[in-house]
Amino acid sequence: MIMVRRRARPAKETGGGSAAAAVASDGALSMDTAAAVAVAGGNHLLDDQYFASPKRKDCRLMKASENLKISSDVVALEEEANNKGVKPTKALTDRTIGVPLATRSQTRTIENFFKADAAAKCGITLNTHHPEPIKEQKTISTTELPLSDELGDEELERVVGDLLYDGHSTASSDSPSYQNENEHEEVMQDTFALRETSPVPVLMADFQTHRSGLRDSHSSSHSSSSSGGASATTDNIFLQEPVLTLDIDRTPTKASSIKINKSFELASAVFSSPPSVLNACRFNQIVTLNGGGQCEPQPVVVAQPQPQPQLQLPPHHNGFELDQHDSSSCDSGVACNLTISAESPAAGGGAGAAARRRKPATPHRILCPSPIKTLPRGDGGGLIVPGARKTSGIMMKGDLLSPRKSPRKLPTTTAAVAACKSRRRLNQPKPQAPYQPQQPQPPPGTQPTNEDVVAAEELENLNKIPIANSNKSNNHVKAMLKPAPAKPRAALTKGSKTKTGSKIQPGPLPLAATNGNREMTDFFPVRRSVRKTKTAVKEEWLRNLEQAVLEERSEGLQVRNFMGKGRGVVAVRHFKRNEFVVEYVGDLISISDATDRERRYALDENAGCYMYYFKHKNQQYCIDATVDTGKLGRLINHSRAGNLMTKVVVIKQRPHLVLLAKDDIAPGEELTYDYGDRSKESLLHHPWLAF
């Protein structure tokens, strides 16, 4: 819908024909009818104000009561002037006739006209919110208005136009279309002149509805400056004047672009600590830090140790190995498969629980918990004990701690690289000194012993050659420029013999033959290495063990009684790691003999169990130390976290069990080792085996 903006028009005058028709009618329009027409006009005025947009800057809403009061005041002034016979001195141009409407009312649609026409024909009246009755002005002679049905369409439009239009609205005068004040005053004067010729006094009612009160409270910047304080403020935030404005920066901006770098450059350290191997596994590419070149993803390979099963090695013949990773507990179980026949009272199926509880056939067994693998030496001796863990050898020097405390062993490649470096360093060519002319070598019989002094004297003699004998000296120098022929190396070889068989000791080479350089061995003797190889260290250590077994050493040990254990052995001196402590001495018997002895010991209530089972060269053996021989090895108590370990040493084709220090043992510490028996029957009768 297109809105057309119009200027304020003067109030239309009712035609003479209309006035005559009104006088000639049957009767004047009653006061109720006049009030109804006025109220209908005010109602349509409110509807027209409702359609006015409060967001327009040139829009202004006024109260209907004030506009109606203005019309009543105009009629009162005209009547007072007629009574006095004098025209009003005050110009009526300052007054406003009708209701001051907004610009939207000036550009109303045809719909408002039909609404006013329908209301006038039906004669509908509006009840105001004011309970006061309509006051009549007795001083004003009421003039009858023609009925709406008697008036034509043209006259009805004029009457409604007088009620709805106000050419002197301050809101309209403040709009941009009324910037010329002189023109506005002329239009207002013409309007009042027309109204004075034929006044139409109408009794108006002062009313105000609730909805109009809420709408009229809205005031804009234009209405507040021209209404003279007529508008009021409201608490409705939707009808208040906006106080915030948007200041949009309309300056043109530069075109932005996105740059993608091919590599990332780190300005500072990203990680507070060095990255670990696990962090390196989380990334599959390496980012260059120099910012140049393309970064290609490179896989990061991290070697992770995988647990390997324990293997049993076949017999070796080049050396032996010592178990360096012995644990405090033994999971090897029973080393030999012993079965108790039905004749045993403890193992018989028909025997009762009392027979079993009386004494087991095997109270407990001393099993080799972690026997150390021993490779046979050149004489054919040695042991291979299956079930033990694979070891990498022993170290005597600098390896005196337990496997948990021992330093990490260097790989063999390190020693090979060091040897290659030493070989390259020794095979480097000798630096050549500048050639210096020297005098012929004197006869061997007159050669002094101190060669340094002789060389210094030769240099001094060369500087003191007289100038007169220049020819002789030149010839002499030319002769010295030719180096003396070196003797063949074969003749100088140490230990070489002549035809007569006598050895020739090599003498020092002349300085001319060596170009003025001397051998390092002329000043320093040859230093021989005193370090021993790993094989030599092992052999020496085994010889010491054999010597200790043959001598039956038991030094630094003492027997003591312990609460709940009985007798035990403590150390009275310091023992180093892998040092010989004591031998487990007893009768070396086979498995069949051990089975018979177990049956016999089961019948004796006072007999203990001192039978040590172990395996040697894929054959099961047992050392029976039940008989008290006074040896201290049989008195060492059990502990799963013991400080001793067992090793098999072969001497004269006979295996011996020796106990070595697993860690450094301080004086006063009890000596213990793991018996290795984890059978249910043994744990049932001897619960202390679990500790």
From Swiss-Prot:
InterPro entries: KMT5A (IPR051760), KMT5A-like (IPR016858), KMT5A-like_SET (IPR047266), SET_dom (IPR001214), SET_dom_sf (IPR046341). Keywords: Cell cycle, Cell division, Chromatin regulator, Chromosome, Methyltransferase, Mitosis, Nucleus, Repressor, S-adenosyl-L-methionine, Transcription, Transcription regulation, Transferase. One of its GO terms (cellular component) is polytene chromosome. Residues 431-446 have a biased composition (Pro residues). The keyword Transcription regulation applies. GO terms for biological process: cell division; methylation; regulation of DNA damage response, signal transduction by p53 class mediator; regulation of transcription by RNA polymerase II. This is Histone-lysine N-methyltransferase Set8.
